[in-house]
Structures are given as C-alpha cells and as structure tokens.
Amino acid sequence: MASLAPLSVAAEVALAAVGATALLVSGAIAVYAFGSFLLMGRHVGARERSRSLRELARELWIAGVTQPLLPLFYFLGRRMDAFFVQRGKEGLAARSAAPRTPIVFVHGYMQNRVGFLGLARALARTGLGPMFGFNYPWFSSIASNARRLERFVAAVCKETGSATVDLVCHSMGGLIAVEMMSDEARRESLKVRRCVTIASPHAGVMWQGPLLGFGAGSLRRGSKLLEAHAGHKLTVPCLSVYSTHDNIVHPKESASLALRGGRDVEVDGLAHLSILFSPKVAEHVAEFLREPDPV
C-alpha cells in the first residue's frame, strides 16, 4: 500500500493553528459556562441538579455551535431571513398575511448576529419579516452604538420603504435599544414600532470582575447610564423576556421593564444563550409583534 505523502510545512502550521484555535475556543466556552453557572447559583433559587446539568449541557452545546461561527457572521447575515426563505404556497401565504414591518436583531456583549439564527428561523416560519441583523463594535460605548443603531434603522426603512421597524434585542443589545429610545432628541424621529428585549440586564449585572470595552462599565448595577434609563418611561410598546435561571442576568428582576411601562414575560430555567433558541420564547416574540398597534 502506498504511503501518504508528508505534509508540507505550511500545511503543518495551518493544522497546528486550527488545533490551537479549537482548544482556545473550547476552553473559553467551558470557562464561560461553568464559571457563570457557579456564580448564578449564589443569586437564584435552587433547583434539581438534573435540570441544572441539562441546561448547562444545552448552553455548552449552543455555545459550541454558534461561537466558532462568530467570525463568519461579521460578513454574513445582514438579511437574516435570507437563510430561511419559505417555499411553496403555504410559506407565501403566511408572508403575505403577516405585517410587513422589518425586524432588526440587535446582539449582545461580545457577540454578533449569529446568535439569532434559531430565533430568525422560528419567526420566518410564522411569516414575519423581512429580517435584518445589526452588527456593532461591542467594545464601544452604549451611547455610540445607539447612534449606530439609529443609522442602521434609518437605512433599513429606506431600503424596505417602511416607516418603522421592530427591534428584537439580546442582552446588551436591549440596553442599546433603550438608550436610543430614551434620547429625547431622537423621539420625534424615532422609527421603532415595537421593541423586544431578551435576557437584557436593565438593572445591571451582578458580576464585579473585569469586563472589556468602553461600554462595559454601563452593564454593572448602579451605573449612571442604567440609572438614567430607570428614570425614563418607555414611549414604545416594549416586551422583556427573561429567564428564572439566566447564568448572566440574575436575579430575574434585573431584566424587568414593568415599572417603566413595558411588559414582562418570565420563562423557566433557560440560560443566557439558549434562551434565543427556545420555541416558547419565539412564540412570545411572534405574538407580541403581531399584536395590533395601540390606538
């Protein structure tokens, strides 16, 4: 049997780089999941060990699938529904019967639009859309990213011919959306019909360790930005979806918008990334976006 040709030096270096990257990503995912679940246990109610282990495994699985795709989705995914175009009469009927308000997804800290793949797929099945994924430099300040979001929303409205968009935000993305909607100078020209925040720390996170980026300090409890947000009543219909056992945003009350005029929906036991892949969460989001506008 003929022996395999030896690898070139370049191929060996490439394989070594891929292996090292895989180990680094795997290690980072493991540290994130195990560390955050351990911290969560100090601030939320106890539950069965088997349920905790199942949710930990689910969070590891989802992180393991989505995080290696992060670099790719800096280039892909501006039109999120392009991946899930429904074919046939049933799909076309659903889309024609649905409201044509565009949906803009706003990702969270250290993430990009890849995290919305599951939710975009679920919403596309209901005929909602068109859907756009907004990427922003997460290391920049929340205020500057709110200005970027405003420009992106204006571009989507111009592209689609719609007067408004619906925002669907995860984690820090919800704070960026609230910052944009809280600015009195923007209110007259605001192009947002409805806003959904999912696992967003509206009252800040408990974590007191190091955080990267210019906007990181605004994520902490008691930050000036979050205190300013708390003083503003929401002028757009808003829904906050949060988990009883979010490994990043806890206790659950820190995600509430009820006191500001929003609506809260609580789901049981989902972790910070896996909440975006929950059929129940997708159902809540779709129902809210389909509600008739207040008169």
Residue ranges and their predicted role:
Residues 119, 250-257:
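Short alpha-helix in the alpha/beta-hydrolase fold that links the catalytic acid
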Residues 152-156, 284-295:
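C-terminal alpha-helix
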Residues 104-114, 120-124, 128-235, 241, ...:
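Serine-dependent carboxylesterase/thioesterase catalytic core
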Residues 243-249, 272-273:
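Acidic catalytic loop of the alpha/beta-hydrolase fold
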Residues 146, 276-291:
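Post-His helix in hydrolase/transferase enzymes
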Residues 99-101, 232-238, 259-263:
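Short, proline-enriched alpha-helix->beta-strand connector loops that line the catalytic pocket
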Residues 1-103, 117:
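Flexible, membrane-associating and regulatory peripheral segments of lipid-active enzymes
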Residues 133-137, 265-277:
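Short glycine-rich catalytic loops that host catalytic nucleophiles or stabilize transition states
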